[in-house]
Amino acid sequence: VSLLGGGIVPCASALSPKAKLVELKVKSPEKDFPIRNVWVWTPAVPADQVKLLPVVYMLHGWPGSPNGMIAGVVAPLAKAFAHGAAPFIAVFPDGNALTHADSEWADSDDGRAMIETWLTKYVIKAVEAGNIRSRHDRAILGFSMGGYGAGIIALHHPNLYGQVITLAGYFVIDDLTNAFGYAPTHAAKAAYQTPTTFLKVANQVRWFLGESSQDYTELIRGQAAAWGKKLKSVKASYTESVESGGHSYIFVSNEIPKVTAWLKWAPMKPATPAPSASAIPTNSLRPTPSPTA
């Protein structure tokens, strides 16, 4: 099934396209969740333009779920697009885990959760099946733990993501439930999950670093500025942003207008067909918004 190649149903009037939220179930090579959920929000654009839109993958925090991110960003995105911002498709994967609840959006050292592999090898193929985007038309965004996840995944895969947005993210190890394992393998896994290990490739990606002036979370406070200094040392392109809202999706919502203005996309080109991936679309009912991270 090609979701983006034709996944928006034209309404009665071709002049009045409507936004659409669809849930996919995408297979994952892991024990915790062999099938994981992904929500895909397509903005109100003509059906023939959907397959040409850029795609932004949006990662939630912990504890949390896609619901919180959807509740925080869809309304400000729709408003920004209505006022002329370049539209894109927003994708909300579920990065939760069972064995190691604080997943850090990683492949756990024991392989029980394979979230990074799932996101980069399975979700992209499922969501973009009608037109696999280039890195210039694909970005990754995250809040809190999702901000860490967005940053480290972009550093691991600069060939996949041309832009990364971290909102209240952090750039240090915060492995609360031992997703990165125990001795003797922990040291190597921890190094792989440490952003500074990959600082030399950080200049291959554009960075948006957002942090609330009212966020007093010890792990978060000052992380954007500290990472910005490291990015400057390797001549990476980055923007720092400070907004109100504390450590919450209110802050995320406040950042969205800046994010949409900051993003840069490649000129639109005709879609290149690609093999469809294994994804099962379900009813396009909006999930109940969650106020948690």
Residue map of PLM features:
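Non-catalytic cap/lid and distal C-terminal segments of serine-dependent acyl enzymes
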Residues: V1-A293
